[in-house]
From Swiss-Prot:
Belongs to the methyltransferase superfamily. L-isoaspartyl/D-aspartyl protein methyltransferase family. The keyword Transferase applies. Disulfide bonds: none annotated. One of its GO terms (molecular function) is protein-L-isoaspartate (D-aspartate) O-methyltransferase activity. Catalyzes the methyl esterification of L-isoaspartyl residues in peptides and proteins that result from spontaneous decomposition of normal L-aspartyl and L-asparaginyl residues. It plays a role in the repair and/or degradation of damaged proteins. It is an enzyme of class 2 (transferase). It is found in: Cytoplasm. This is Protein-L-isoaspartate O-methyltransferase. Pfam families: PCMT. The active site is at S64. The gene is pcm. The keyword Transferase applies. It comes from the Bacteria.
């Protein structure tokens, strides 16, 4: 895996910003520091790659604010042996962070352009335990199996039972829930046998999750 080579002052400020905002998990901080965010943003935005802000990418999507990436990752309580499903690959940045903390990442992206670019970028940077699939995040194939952890990186209006059923007992799902132009809340769901225990975490703002596959974009 390629590690970040950001100039020391930028990297130090990046880490300090995350710590000041409450990120304390050492493994998460190390993963955030190691992944070269500047390699996942468009060239025109690379000067701002290490700032704590979301940035636009292709297909009207965004690469999430680093604090949000770190916070969601921390809330997943990841372990090295976990198998994780990500819905919404985007640039591939969050998948790269997650890949340093778990055994396998399966990431589903509905936009062909984003899926192809993320797959190529992750391969170039040697993130070998990430599989990027072109697909509909609302219709994960049964053959995908089940997962220890699930993360959704676009806002859904609700969580479907088929998605919850992909979570192994003892597993955790993190997702932003709410309308595209209204209040959204980051939700953590823990599966206890056949019960799904929900907890509201923080208010957030994400692009909306869309159904279908955009093969022409």
């Amino acid at each position: 895996m390629v590690s970040s080579v950001a100039p020391p002052p930028e990297k130090m400020m990046f880490q300090l910003s995350l710590r000041r905002r409450g990120i304390s998990d050492r493994a998460v901080l190390q993963a955030m520091e190691a992944v070269p965010r500047d390699r996942f943003v468009d060239p025109v935005h690379r000067d701002g790659a290490w700032r704590d802000t979301a940035l636009p990418i292709a297909c009207g999507q965004t690469i999430s604010q680093p604090f949000v990436v770190a916070y969601m990752t921390e809330q997943l309580r990841l372990e090295a042996g976990h198998r994780l499903l990500e819905i919404g690959t985007g640039s591939g940045y969050h998948a790269a962070v997650l890949s340093r903390l778990v055994r396998d990442v399966v990431s589903v992206e509905r936009f062909k352009t984003l899926a192809d670019r993320a797959r190529a970028r992750l391969k170039e940077l040697n993130y070998a335990n990430v599989e990027v699939l072109l697909g509909d995040g609302f219709a994960i194939p049964e053959g995908a199996g089940t997962f220890d952890r699930i993360i959704v990186t676009a806002a859904m209006t609700e969580l479907s039972q088929p998605l919850l059923d992909l979570l192994d007992p003892g597993g955790i799902l993190i997702a932003p829930i709410g309308p595209a132009n209204g209040r959204q809340t980051l939700i953590r769901v823990e599966r206890k046998d056949d019960d799904f225990i929900r907890k509201a975490l923080v208010d957030v703002r994400f692009v909306p999750a869309l159904t279908g596959i955009a093969r022409e974009l």
